[in-house]
């Protein structure tokens, strides 16, 4: 099982490391995330380096989730996968049963790119709509720190929440 990490900053200050385990029974989805953590695929169709490094969590909703992974636009409207722009929902084996799950953000069926979210509570209403592909194994305290960040009315953090460094362990 692959393990990836995010070294996070909030408002430019180090906030700690989040370590995530990727599930083997969603191999295509997990591989997309892993490769975007390492940045090994180089420049993507958008002309941007295909990596989460330097990207932000653009949406934080307490008692729900933290969303990030838009490395092309940074506002939730962009992102791309290692397979091209978008890819299909792989399966819905895993359910949104606990905090700390890693799941794909999308704009409807078959629209997975690079955006993901980390749950901060169980979110069963997302089952069958979003592909769960991993879980936080260390650094839930960092997730809680991000969750507590003040946001504007559009759920955008007032202090920049950035993935300063990321990769595979």
Swiss-Prot record:
Entry annotated with the keyword Translocase: no
Pfam families attached to this UniProt entry: Pro_isomerase
EC number: 5.2.1.8
GO molecular function annotation: cyclosporin A binding; peptidyl-prolyl cis-trans isomerase activity
GO cellular component, one term: cytoplasm
Location in the cell: Cytoplasm
Keyword Magnesium among UniProt keywords: no
Function: PPIases accelerate the folding of proteins. It catalyzes the cis-trans isomerization of proline imidic peptide bonds in oligopeptides.
Matches recorded under PANTHER family: PEPTIDYL-PROLYL CIS-TRANS ISOMERASE (PTHR11071), PEPTIDYL-PROLYL CIS-TRANS ISOMERASE D-RELATED (PTHR11071:SF561)
Name of the protein: Peptidyl-prolyl cis-trans isomerase
Organism of provenance: Unspecified eudicot DB-1992
